[in-house]
């Protein structure tokens, strides 16, 4: 393509080309012609990640200085709305300029904000982040959240992804309950709280992995996909009655993935675990829309088998249940137990995976 043709491309074509480039490549298009010189400065989506940098020969101090200069340069020359801002790098720790950048973004109706600090201590999010009322997607890695007392929630937020984060129990509960449009929630390797009370009327997807004591749902009737990974079996307080209470509040669940530590009752609770028949008779309970189930790390103890039996006998739409034991010990007996359970769905398939 000749230079004149490049210069005369329609605006929407130029925008499409720029949207496919990294911010580094987009800035370089300024040399193509005068019409392209600052065209990149109108990009609504700004992504600063490893693809934008080439700092392999620099020491950490020089890398940080270069990072700050790049982001400052782009934000200074940028002209127009900023809908998405992503900052992800292994050397972001100790860069106080992040506060200043977030303050700048809070004045530009930011809709999608992603901050991933791969090393170092938790980065305390500045109070100005909590004034970003146009946020639709928020993703934080290795951060500390302490909202100001004036924070009333993110009224437009639909997706929240928190990994390696620290926040207090009341902060978590207030955050979730004050995001009325929240549809997707991901929590991984968090600390500061161990009890999760999820109040989210529009929540459809929930993925959790970490160390916690209990999960309960309140007004979360739209939830369809649930994935639970408990990383420390000593923290599990689950028994059949708790699990029943858990699923009674999820009438529209369609897909479930669960790590078996969540199913293991403490020894003193084993005797209190009710039978599936009693639970069904007492509660008239059914998972009418459950289609896919995956249970990992089971060992064949009574709470696990009760739970599997309950799902199989009360899920008329179930298509597939995948079960993976924690070890080879007792695998054949476990398989025989699984095949003995009655299934409410004639099409339900049980898939046994080797450990």
Model regions: which residues?
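Leucine-rich repeat
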Residues: 1-184, 188-190, 207, ...
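Concave beta-strand-loop units of leucine-rich repeat
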Residues: 50-53, 87-92, 115-120, 140-145, ...
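C-terminal capping segment of individual leucine-rich repeats
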Residues: 106-107, 131, 153, 178, ...
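Loop-centered beta-sheet repeat module
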Residues: 192-225
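Extended repeat-based solenoid scaffolds, especially LRR ectodomains
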Residues: 215-265
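Hydrophobic, well-ordered secondary-structure elements that form the walls
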Residues: 256, 293, 311
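C-terminal helix/juxtamembrane-tail motif
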Residues: 329-355
